[in-house]
């Protein structure tokens, strides 16, 4: 089966030109859009739908830094479970502190505080992305890359919680 990277004519690397990925995605998905196959035989319609779904999945995976990191690791035979926790005590403590801070922001309905919290998370995410990219470039650092990918997963979950909180506070 063709890799997500090959679908978009990209080299398998963590650093991606997101604009190029988006342009290529739009080009490819336009070719298999269901409207183009409305009068086609049922088999062709089904194949076009399957290809569109495959392109969507690949695009969503490559667009997200944490999903892209997990995918790269999976190409090397390293499967990261969504449920596996980080075994780093310092990071576990940081997770607890961040969750407590988010809970306090929720309890106080502090929308400005949530915005500041989110900016800090964005900075943390950028640091993790840079760290993963550096580790990925060096095959001897794959264990560290895996550790960073797990941290990226945690931040993704925390971002989802922040978005939910923002929606509740906006109502």
Swiss-Prot record:
Q: Which SUPFAM superfamilies match?
A: Chaperone J-domain (SSF46565), HSC20 (HSCB), C-terminal oligomerisation domain (SSF47144)
CDD domains documented for this protein: DnaJ
The UniProt entry's GO CC annotations, sorted and at most eight, read: iron-sulfur cluster transfer complex
Keyword Chaperone belongs to the record: yes
**Record's keyword annotation contains Signal:** no
InterPro entries hit by this protein:
DnaJ_domain, HscB, HscB_C_sf, HscB_oligo_C, J_dom_sf
Which family does the UniProt entry place this protein in?
A: Belongs to the HscB family.
Q: How does it assemble?
A: Interacts with HscA and stimulates its ATPase activity.
Q: What protein name applies here?
A: Co-chaperone protein HscB homolog
Q: Which organism is it from?
A: Azotobacter vinelandii
Organism lineage reads as: Bacteria, Pseudomonadati, Pseudomonadota, Gammaproteobacteria, Pseudomonadales
Q: What gene, per UniProt, encodes this protein?
A: hscB
